[in-house]
Amino acid sequence: MKEKFKSWAFSKEHGKCDVITLIIYLLGVCTVSFFHEPWFDEAQSWAIARSGTIKEILFEIPHYEGHPPLWHLILVPFAKLGAPYELSLAVVNIFFMTLAVAVLLFKSPFPKLIRCLLPFNFFLFYQYGVISRPYSVLTLSFFLAAAFYPSRNKKPLRYVFSLAFMCMIHSFGIIFAGGLCVVWLSEIILSLIHIS
């Protein structure tokens, strides 16, 4: 019995367990989000998306908000069309975090047990899954960058897209993407030096 569990837990195969984990994650986040009352910074993002013009969101608001405009631009269609504030904010956030968890479950090289437990840690489940902030989109961009990293030299556009996506969502993303670009560039330079 122990050997069977070990072979299952440390298997790197993707399949039913990942789908079940994703469904449980989605149901759990939806349930907790139903009882979550948005915090002031969540409401502020919505108010900016509702009241700001596209020009203000792109060129003025990022200067005092401290992060790039993509999160506000994502919220704009819902806010401007008069969609219910709390429901729309939760749906947008849950959508991006569910995509992020799907990338984690179906593209990561971790053993099955770790993959199936990771989505339920405090940050991925509550801080990023329930509280509607740009971190849900930032998490998706991190996981996409990690998924595309092994093939970055053969298919660089996917990797560059994930880094650009990272830069457009949050100031932390700019720092991380910049660091990853420096590492990638140094790898390219070292490989060129090694060839010649």
List the predicted regions and their residue ranges.
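Transmembrane-helix motifs of polytopic, lipid-linked glycan transferases
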Residues: 23, 91-116
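Start-transfer (signal-anchor) and selected internal transmembrane alpha helices
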Residues: 1-29, 109-112
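Membrane-interface alpha helices of multi-pass inner-membrane proteins
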Residues: 124-126, 143-144, 156-181
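Transmembrane and membrane-interface helices of multi-pass
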Residues: 26, 113-125, 139
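Short hydrophobic/aromatic helix or loop-helix immediately within or flanking a transmembrane segment
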Residues: 46-49, 61-91, 95
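Helix-to-loop transition at the C-terminal end of transmembrane segments
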Residues: 27-45
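Conserved small/polar residues in nucleotide/adenosyl-binding loops
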Residues: 193-195
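Short acidic/glycine- and proline-prone juxtamembrane loop motifs at membrane-interface regions
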Residues: 130-136
